[in-house]
Each structure stands twice: as structure tokens, then as C-alpha cells.
């Protein structure tokens, strides 16, 4: 029985990126890349399952041979990269997003959105990113993955685009905690975080676990053959539902409690270690 647990029939692996697959310096190590390549060569589907938008996914990941699928914006979108096709979506209606902007204005926060596969950020926030306590490597990601626009409300009215995710950054922790408490009470929203000073808003039923399950159904892969690795609050459902749920040693304690296995840290190639532990690669 113990041997059976160590070597399940893993056929689909969902990997969070920041704090999980990538090092703290946002690097994919050669060994981790090699392990992912071995999985894909063996017919195991490996995919990023991230809070990032499509334009924020590093090309060195998507260009790995055989890397076909990606889960974006905490599960709001599942893409088939090979066919350039959306397989599944679970977004916030644009009209509802407009209403939420009025609520967000009551907080001292930077906010922007993911929609149409890209990030959209008002100039007033984009030009002052450094004032919201954002780490340098995240600041760089924000600047390279967002489109600068003058008025988010007008953009929404013109494009009528479903919103994959709303991002918020806070300079003060007390402001973030207040927003987390208050926004968390709104029934049609799911409020999570992946960084020390951010909040991420999705529709209430949107999460990485739901997206993984739907991709599993599309690919005819049962839950028990799904493996998921993560470190943060926004990985909870994915790690909990997976047949093999893996939490990083550097991850949230609540995530470790629902995981089947706690691996090494992201700076110790914990993803590669976990995959080698459970898969014959």
C-alpha cells in the first residue's frame, strides 16, 4: 500500500509558478526544467497553473517541447497553447467589475485587471507602482505585463470584456487586512493572495482546483491521476482536490495541512524533488 502511494499513476501536473516552480529570483533551474521535459516526453501533461495573465508567462516555460496547456488568472482561463484556443473560462462579468471598481476606490490601493489575455492598468497606478510596497521583481513583472490606459471604466465600457482577475497591491498591511475582511464578505467573489502585500479577486467559483478538474475532464484524466504543487493561499483548492497534493516547505501552513506531501522549498528545487518522488522520471 505504501508503494502504491509513492508511485500513483500521475498523468497531469499543475504547477504554481511564483514561490513554487520558480526560485525567489524568478528562475527556472536547469534541473527543474529537465524534470519537466522528462515528464512531457513520457506523456505526462505538465502545465503552469498561475495567478498570472498570459502575457506574464515566461517564454522559457511555454516553449518547452510538449508544454501545451496553461491555467491563468487563478483558474479564470484554461488555454490550449498549441491550438491557441480557450478551453474553459470562469470570469467576472464586465458589468459586475465596473460596480466593484467603486468599492475598490474606498481603499488606499493600486488595482488593475486581467482581461482579453492581458493586463490593463491605469496610468495613475502604472506610473506610481513603487509607492505600493511592491518588490522589485514583481514591479518589473507588472510593468512588462500591463497595458497603460487612461480610464479603466471607459475601457471596460468600450470592450465589454469579461474580467479574469482583479489585482490589488497595498503599501500598508492594515489596509490590506481591512480589504481582505470586507471584500471577503461579498458572496459572488473569491478573495485570495499570493504575495505578502496583494489581494486577488476572482468570481466566487473560480479557483485553480476548479480549472484543473475541468481540464482533467477534457483530457479524460481522473482526479487521482492529477498532481498539483503550490505555496500560497490561491493554490489551496488545487492542492486539496488533487490526487497528489504537494505544498512547498516555504508555503502557507494552511496549505501544508491539506497537502499529501510537503516538499523542499522553491529555492531547493522542491517541484523537481516532488515529481521525482511520485513519478517514474
What are the residue ranges of the model-derived segments?
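Mg2+-dependent phosphoryl-transfer enzymes with acidic/Ser/Thr/Gly-rich catalytic loops
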Residues: 2-12, 28-29, 184, 199-281
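Conserved acidic, metal-coordinating active-site core of Asp-based
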Residues: 107-109, 114-229, 233
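Short active-site oxyanion
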Residues: 43-47, 66-68, 165, 224-225, ...
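Active-site metal-binding loops of divalent metal-dependent hydrolases
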Residues: 21, 75, 230-232
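Short, structured coil segments at secondary-structure junctions
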Residues: 64-66, 74, 82, 186-187, ...
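Asp-based phosphoryl-transfer active-site loop
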Residues: 9-25, 100
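Active-site phosphate-binding/coordination module
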Residues: 30-135
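Short, acidic loop-to-helix structural element flanking the phosphoryl-transfer center
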Residues: 26-42, 89-96, 149-153, 205-217
